[in-house]
A protein has these predicted regions:
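Active-site cores that bind ATP or allylic diphosphates and position pyrophosphate for catalysis
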Residues: 3-131, 137-138, 162
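Catalytic adenosine-cofactor/nucleotide-binding cores of aminoacyl-tRNA synthetases and other
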Residues: 96, 108-209
Protein backbone atom coordinates (compact mmCIF):
# COMPACT_ATOMS: atom_id res chain seq x y z
CA UNK A 1 0.00 0.00 0.00
CA UNK A 2 2.93 2.31 0.68
CA UNK A 3 3.94 2.61 -2.97
CA UNK A 4 0.41 3.70 -3.91
CA UNK A 5 0.38 6.33 -1.17
CA UNK A 6 3.73 7.63 -2.37
CA UNK A 7 2.44 7.71 -5.95
CA UNK A 8 -0.63 9.73 -4.94
CA UNK A 9 1.46 12.17 -2.92
CA UNK A 10 3.88 12.59 -5.82
CA UNK A 11 1.01 13.20 -8.25
CA UNK A 12 -0.70 15.69 -5.96
CA UNK A 13 -3.71 13.45 -5.25
CA UNK A 14 -2.80 13.09 -1.58
CA UNK A 15 -0.76 14.92 1.03
CA UNK A 16 0.76 14.43 4.47
CA UNK A 17 -1.07 16.38 7.15
CA UNK A 18 0.44 17.06 10.58
CA UNK A 19 -2.40 16.85 13.09
CA UNK A 20 -2.75 16.54 16.82
CA UNK A 21 -3.87 13.12 18.05
CA UNK A 22 -7.55 13.00 19.03
CA UNK A 23 -6.79 11.29 22.35
CA UNK A 24 -5.74 14.58 23.91
CA UNK A 25 -2.13 13.50 24.35
CA UNK A 26 -0.83 16.43 22.36
CA UNK A 27 1.14 14.10 20.09
CA UNK A 28 1.48 15.36 16.52
CA UNK A 29 0.87 12.68 13.90
CA UNK A 30 1.54 12.71 10.17
CA UNK A 31 -1.56 11.28 8.53
CA UNK A 32 -2.18 11.00 4.80
CA UNK A 33 -5.26 12.68 3.36
CA UNK A 34 -6.76 12.48 -0.13
CA UNK A 35 -6.97 15.80 -1.95
CA UNK A 36 -10.67 15.84 -2.77
CA UNK A 37 -11.43 17.48 -6.15
CA UNK A 38 -15.05 18.13 -5.07
CA UNK A 39 -16.67 16.71 -8.19
CA UNK A 40 -19.66 14.60 -9.20
CA UNK A 41 -18.81 10.91 -9.37
CA UNK A 42 -21.09 8.75 -11.50
CA UNK A 43 -21.10 4.96 -11.64
CA UNK A 44 -23.42 2.31 -13.01
CA UNK A 45 -24.79 -0.11 -10.46
CA UNK A 46 -26.21 -3.43 -11.67
CA UNK A 47 -29.11 -3.05 -9.25
CA UNK A 48 -29.59 0.68 -8.69
CA UNK A 49 -28.74 1.83 -12.20
CA UNK A 50 -26.84 5.08 -12.72
CA UNK A 51 -25.79 6.69 -9.44
CA UNK A 52 -24.29 10.18 -9.17
CA UNK A 53 -22.88 11.54 -5.91
CA UNK A 54 -20.98 14.76 -5.24
CA UNK A 55 -17.80 14.37 -3.21
CA UNK A 56 -17.83 17.88 -1.73
CA UNK A 57 -19.25 16.76 1.62
CA UNK A 58 -16.53 14.10 2.00
CA UNK A 59 -13.79 16.66 2.58
CA UNK A 60 -10.16 15.62 2.32
CA UNK A 61 -10.72 12.17 3.78
CA UNK A 62 -8.00 10.18 5.53
CA UNK A 63 -6.24 7.47 3.51
CA UNK A 64 -3.74 6.27 6.10
CA UNK A 65 -2.55 6.84 9.66
CA UNK A 66 0.92 7.13 8.13
CA UNK A 67 2.75 5.76 5.10
CA UNK A 68 2.76 2.27 6.61
CA UNK A 69 -0.79 2.05 8.03
CA UNK A 70 -3.49 2.25 5.33
CA UNK A 71 -7.11 2.65 6.33
CA UNK A 72 -10.18 0.91 4.91
CA UNK A 73 -10.82 2.78 1.65
CA UNK A 74 -7.23 2.67 0.42
CA UNK A 75 -6.77 -0.94 1.52
CA UNK A 76 -9.84 -2.30 -0.28
CA UNK A 77 -9.09 -0.41 -3.49
CA UNK A 78 -5.47 -1.55 -3.64
CA UNK A 79 -6.26 -5.13 -2.64
CA UNK A 80 -9.05 -5.43 -5.21
CA UNK A 81 -6.82 -3.93 -7.91
CA UNK A 82 -3.88 -6.23 -7.21
CA UNK A 83 -6.12 -9.30 -6.99
CA UNK A 84 -7.85 -8.50 -10.29
CA UNK A 85 -11.34 -8.09 -8.81
CA UNK A 86 -13.82 -7.20 -11.57
CA UNK A 87 -17.12 -7.12 -9.62
CA UNK A 88 -17.88 -5.74 -6.16
CA UNK A 89 -21.12 -7.13 -4.73
CA UNK A 90 -22.04 -5.78 -1.31
CA UNK A 91 -24.85 -4.31 0.77
CA UNK A 92 -26.42 -0.98 -0.14
CA UNK A 93 -25.10 0.48 3.11
CA UNK A 94 -21.77 0.69 1.25
CA UNK A 95 -23.09 2.91 -1.57
CA UNK A 96 -21.77 6.00 0.22
CA UNK A 97 -18.27 4.46 0.26
CA UNK A 98 -18.17 4.11 -3.52
CA UNK A 99 -17.29 7.72 -4.52
CA UNK A 100 -14.25 7.71 -2.22
CA UNK A 101 -13.08 4.43 -3.66
CA UNK A 102 -13.59 5.55 -7.26
CA UNK A 103 -11.53 8.68 -6.58
CA UNK A 104 -8.72 6.50 -5.24
CA UNK A 105 -9.00 4.15 -8.23
CA UNK A 106 -8.56 7.05 -10.61
CA UNK A 107 -5.62 8.39 -8.62
CA UNK A 108 -3.69 5.10 -8.83
CA UNK A 109 -4.79 4.33 -12.42
CA UNK A 110 -6.84 1.31 -11.36
CA UNK A 111 -9.94 0.30 -13.34
CA UNK A 112 -13.30 0.80 -11.66
CA UNK A 113 -14.97 -2.57 -11.05
CA UNK A 114 -18.62 -3.27 -11.76
CA UNK A 115 -20.70 -2.52 -8.68
CA UNK A 116 -23.85 -4.19 -7.42
CA UNK A 117 -25.27 -2.94 -4.13
CA UNK A 118 -27.76 -5.43 -2.71
CA UNK A 119 -30.79 -4.21 -0.76
CA UNK A 120 -30.67 -4.74 2.98
CA UNK A 121 -32.42 -7.78 4.44
CA UNK A 122 -34.95 -6.91 7.14
CA UNK A 123 -36.58 -8.97 9.82
CA UNK A 124 -40.35 -9.28 10.37
CA UNK A 125 -40.13 -6.05 12.43
CA UNK A 126 -38.86 -4.27 9.26
CA UNK A 127 -35.52 -3.58 10.95
CA UNK A 128 -32.14 -4.71 9.64
CA UNK A 129 -31.36 -8.31 10.53
CA UNK A 130 -28.81 -8.57 13.32
CA UNK A 131 -27.77 -10.95 16.09
CA UNK A 132 -28.90 -8.39 18.64
CA UNK A 133 -32.45 -8.71 17.32
CA UNK A 134 -32.39 -12.49 17.35
CA UNK A 135 -31.30 -13.28 13.79
CA UNK A 136 -29.83 -16.76 13.57
CA UNK A 137 -26.66 -17.74 11.70
CA UNK A 138 -27.06 -20.21 8.83
CA UNK A 139 -25.27 -22.88 10.86
CA UNK A 140 -28.08 -22.73 13.43
CA UNK A 141 -30.68 -23.52 10.76
CA UNK A 142 -28.57 -26.48 9.70
CA UNK A 143 -28.51 -27.71 13.31
CA UNK A 144 -32.30 -27.45 13.32
CA UNK A 145 -32.51 -29.82 10.36
CA UNK A 146 -32.81 -27.44 7.43
CA UNK A 147 -31.29 -28.89 4.27
CA UNK A 148 -28.40 -26.91 2.71
CA UNK A 149 -30.19 -26.73 -0.66
CA UNK A 150 -33.36 -25.48 1.04
CA UNK A 151 -31.43 -22.75 2.86
CA UNK A 152 -29.72 -21.69 -0.37
CA UNK A 153 -33.03 -21.74 -2.25
CA UNK A 154 -34.77 -19.72 0.45
CA UNK A 155 -32.03 -17.12 0.76
CA UNK A 156 -31.88 -16.67 -3.02
CA UNK A 157 -35.56 -15.70 -3.00
CA UNK A 158 -35.05 -12.98 -0.40
CA UNK A 159 -35.13 -9.97 -2.72
CA UNK A 160 -34.86 -11.89 -5.99
CA UNK A 161 -37.16 -13.88 -8.27
CA UNK A 162 -36.56 -15.68 -11.56
CA UNK A 163 -39.44 -13.99 -13.37
CA UNK A 164 -41.42 -17.24 -13.51
CA UNK A 165 -43.75 -19.16 -11.20
CA UNK A 166 -41.02 -21.67 -10.39
CA UNK A 167 -39.76 -21.47 -6.80
CA UNK A 168 -38.02 -24.76 -6.06
CA UNK A 169 -34.49 -24.78 -7.47
CA UNK A 170 -31.48 -27.02 -7.08
CA UNK A 171 -28.06 -25.47 -6.60
CA UNK A 172 -27.20 -25.88 -10.29
CA UNK A 173 -30.55 -24.45 -11.39
CA UNK A 174 -30.02 -21.37 -9.22
CA UNK A 175 -26.56 -20.83 -10.68
CA UNK A 176 -28.10 -20.96 -14.15
CA UNK A 177 -31.10 -18.74 -13.37
CA UNK A 178 -29.70 -16.14 -10.99
CA UNK A 179 -29.27 -12.67 -12.46
CA UNK A 180 -28.29 -9.62 -10.41
CA UNK A 181 -30.46 -7.43 -12.62
CA UNK A 182 -33.55 -9.20 -11.22
CA UNK A 183 -32.67 -8.31 -7.63
CA UNK A 184 -35.20 -5.85 -6.24
CA UNK A 185 -34.12 -2.32 -5.34
CA UNK A 186 -36.07 -2.02 -2.08
CA UNK A 187 -35.16 -3.83 1.17
CA UNK A 188 -36.27 -7.46 1.38
CA UNK A 189 -37.94 -9.09 4.38
CA UNK A 190 -36.68 -12.46 5.61
CA UNK A 191 -39.58 -14.82 6.30
CA UNK A 192 -38.70 -17.86 8.40
CA UNK A 193 -42.07 -19.47 7.66
CA UNK A 194 -41.27 -19.31 3.96
CA UNK A 195 -37.87 -20.90 4.63
CA UNK A 196 -39.65 -23.74 6.45
CA UNK A 197 -41.81 -24.21 3.33
CA UNK A 198 -38.71 -24.40 1.12
CA UNK A 199 -37.24 -26.97 3.48
CA UNK A 200 -40.40 -29.07 3.38
CA UNK A 201 -40.46 -29.02 -0.43
CA UNK A 202 -36.81 -30.06 -0.65
CA UNK A 203 -37.41 -32.79 1.95
CA UNK A 204 -40.20 -34.17 -0.24
CA UNK A 205 -37.77 -34.46 -3.14
CA UNK A 206 -35.32 -36.62 -1.21
CA UNK A 207 -35.19 -40.29 -2.30
CA UNK A 208 -37.17 -42.58 -0.02
CA UNK A 209 -34.99 -44.73 2.24
Amino acid sequence: HKKYLEKMIENGNAYVSKEEAKDGSGVIKEIVRFKNPNIDVTFNDLIKGEVTMNTKDLGDFVLAKNLNEPLFHLAVVVDDFEEGVTHVIRGEDHVSNTPRQILIQRAIDAPTPIYAHLPLVLGPDKLKLSKRRGALPITEYQKQGFLPEAILNGIAFVGWNPGTEKEIFTHDELVEAFDLERVQKSPAVFNETKLEWFNKEHMNKLPYQ
